[in-house]
From Swiss-Prot:
The active site is at 7, 70, 142. GO terms for cellular component: cytoplasm; Holliday junction resolvase complex. Its EC number is 3.1.21.10. GO terms for biological process: DNA recombination; DNA repair. It is an enzyme of class 3 (hydrolase). Mg(2+) 1 binds at residues 7, 142. This is Crossover junction endodeoxyribonuclease RuvC. Coiled coil: none annotated. It comes from Ehrlichia ruminantium (strain Welgevonden). Gene3D superfamilies: Ribonuclease H-like superfamily/Ribonuclease H.
Length: 160
């Protein structure tokens, strides 16, 4: 089973494909990861279209079965929150077009499932990702956040 974790952003949407074979949820493998980058010199419509087309290509390339994403978080800056909502909307549409079910988790639940602490810092989450997947957690936090939400989903499935 291939699971995609997504960290939404209009600037840099992080994604990670994790694989679990034969329902062995103790053996999680990182298949691939990356970021969908958009330029703030483009129109919002062009940026959203890039997110849509790149995510659709990723979903088709890796035969993704399910998706996971953090629940929406509204911050104090209304403009930032609005732009995040635009990106999330396109991500939801893309998953729907590809017929991929989405599972959403709160940020605290993701952190708690990875580190045991719902208020863990991003560095602690990265440290645990390195231990769980036996990889080096480098790059940007949008990718590690995507990996974390995918692991959270796998752990949620395993619990049932």
């Amino acid at each position: 089973m291939n699971i995609i974790g997504i960290d939404p952003s209009l600037n840099s949407t992080g994604w990670a494909i994790l694989s679990v074979h034969d329902n062995n949820y103790n053996e999680i493998r990182l298949v691939d990861n990356g970021s969908i980058l958009t330029s703030n010199k483009k129109t919002i419509g062009e940026r959203l279209n890039k997110i849509y087309s790149e995510l659709l290509n990723i979903l088709n390339s890796y035969k993704v079965d399910t998706a996971s994403m953090e629940e929406i978080f509204i911050n104090k800056n209304p403009k930032s929150s609005t732009l995040l909502c635009y990106a999330r909307g396109v991500l939801l549409l893309t998953l729907n077009v590809a017929c991929i079910p989405l599972f959403e988790y709160s940020a605290n639940r993701v952190k708690k499932s990875i580190t045991g602490n719902g208020h863990a810092k991003k560095e602690q989450v990265c440290f645990m990702i390195e231990n769980i997947l036996n990889i080096k957690c480098h790059g940007t936090y949008d990718i590690s956040d995507a990996i974390a939400v995918a692991i959270c989903h796998i752990y949620s499935i395993k619990a049932f």
